[in-house]
């Protein structure tokens, strides 16, 4: 039942996320979902009934879906169409590498220290990840960015396609002309 309720929480969140993402930016939504996961995992230490466990797994399903589902939007916003397949593959591989570490860790901690205790280190890991995301993901994550290309010749095709006096703006994605996000 717990996994079923996790899935139910996840699906219900996925159904309402399009409306939520129309009103709030991806950063706020995804960090809120991660905060739900962090709080839920810390609360897991105090679960003392089966019904409490079921409620917890429902809430964790919500947090998981809200924190993970918009990932595809970020990849589409951040990369040119030529690079998206590689980024989606990298995200898939990275998420599975994280699971490859987390699943055995949860099993080992549960076996050696108990299931309730295991919620605490998992909550700490989630809190650290959320804190890093909060620090490195800019609050003003604009898609159109004013920038310059000091490294390109003045007759470069990219520069000629934009009106500029040394600087120009357009939907900014990582590609061969934009190797890094501007500071």
Regions found by a protein language model. Give the residues of each.
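C-terminal transmembrane bundle of multi-pass solute transporters/carriers
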Residues: 1-140
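Intrinsic disorder in cytosolic terminal tails and internal cytosolic loops
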Residues: 136-183
């Amino acid at each position: 039942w717990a996994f079923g309720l996790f899935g139910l929480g996840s699906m219900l969140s996925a159904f309402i996320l399009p409306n939520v993402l129309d009103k709030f930016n991806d950063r706020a939504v995804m960090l809120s979902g991660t905060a739900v996961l962090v709080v839920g995992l810390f609360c897991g230490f105090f679960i003392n009934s089966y019904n409490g466990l079921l409620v917890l797994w429902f809430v964790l399903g919500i947090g998981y879906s809200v924190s993970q589902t918009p990932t595809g939007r970020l990849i589409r916003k951040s990369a040119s169409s030529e690079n998206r397949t590689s980024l989606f593959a990298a995200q898939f591989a990275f998420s599975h590498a994280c699971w490859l570490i987390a699943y055995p860790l949860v099993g080992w901690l549960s076996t050696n220290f108990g299931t309730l205790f295991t919620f605490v280190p998992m909550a700490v890991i989630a809190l650290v990840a959320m804190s890093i995301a909060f620090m490195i993901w800019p609050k003003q994550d604009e898609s159109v960015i004013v920038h310059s290309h000091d490294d390109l010749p003045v007759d470069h095709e990219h520069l000629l396609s934009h009106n500029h006096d040394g600087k120009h703006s357009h939907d900014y994605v990582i590609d061969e002309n934009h190797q890094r996000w501007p500071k």
